[in-house]
Amino acid sequence: MALKLGVIGTGAIGQDHIRRCSKTLVGSQVVAVTDINLEQAAKVVRELDIGAEVYADGHALIAAPDVEAVLVCSWGPSHEEYVLAAIAAGKPVFCEKPLAVTAEGCRHIVEAEIASGRRLVQVGFMRPYDQGYRALKSVIDSGRIGEPLMLHCAHRNPRVGENYKTDMAITDTLIHELNVLRWLLNDDYVSVQVVFPRKTSKALAHMKDPQIVMLETARGTRIDVEVFVNCQYGYDIQCEVVGESGIAKLPEPSQVQLRSEAKLSNAILMDWKDRFIAAYDVELQDFIDGVNAGTIYGPSAWDGYAAAVAADACVQAQNSGAVVPIALEMRPAFYD
């Protein structure tokens, strides 16, 4: 029997999730939608021909008797409110990042979920579902390259919009690395420093770009992440793990190799959605399957909280230039 989903937020990512849950994935049916712009929500229902009911707001949708699980895809500052409401209603909830806009807000969600007595929250970190990252983690976990000593990573975007500010390199961009690298290493961060190289002429006047974020983990692994959001040439994600006896590198997306006009070339993707489109499908299918089976295994509220704590420290390091400690308490046994 199909899991009946309610989707809060019908912007770009909300529409994508409605489409995949209705047309691509198995075991789910979108029966309810809402958006701050109700006309937009109704338009999405018509265009996708899904027959879902449009609710006045997120709280009405969560309370609807036929909604069995909730997808929160709305504006970031609204996430905490809706996730807490879903937990209070006893309904599983998939929340796009951020889980909340502050670490304190994420902590409220963790506490509410623990009080409920069961896992109800999955956070929309999609990279652990990417085939390349999974293959990289398999090599690390096998011990084939020994213990990880260093990671060299990069997160490059061709360009960003006028509203993008320097701290968003952490909260909107690096946040994915903060989650996936912690997952890759099964290790928590203990400190961070951020430095700014020479500024690119392609960056807007109000922002600093690129940035280099240097992290240290509890076991002493050193990580450097280049964040360059005006690189011009494409959307490019890199991750190289230097171990005691070898090096493992995140594979490039599969592209046709072209021999033409005296050149050997491979195309570089320009859009993050194209780079991780398959991971989005696997991620949401995992949520649907988990809810239908009675157990959610995906990125947890604690993972969302850990990423938020690290992000807060990174922003502090941006502003100070100093090495900033990252203080994360021990993970509750509830999330083991």
UniProtKB/Swiss-Prot annotation:
EC number in record: 1.1.1.18
Keyword annotations: NAD, Oxidoreductase
Pfam families referenced in this protein's UniProt entry, alphabetically: GFO_IDH_MocA, GFO_IDH_MocA_C
Enzyme class at the top of the EC tree: oxidoreductase
GO biological process assignments: inositol catabolic process
GO molecular function annotations of the record: inositol 2-dehydrogenase (NAD+) activity; nucleotide binding
Catalytic activity: myo-inositol + NAD(+) = scyllo-inosose + NADH + H(+)
Function: Involved in the oxidation of myo-inositol (MI) to 2-keto-myo-inositol (2KMI or 2-inosose).
Subunit structure of this chain's protein: Homotetramer.
Family: Belongs to the Gfo/Idh/MocA family.
Name assigned to this protein: Inositol 2-dehydrogenase
Species name: Pseudomonas savastanoi pv. phaseolicola (strain 1448A / Race 6)
Gene designation per UniProt: iolG
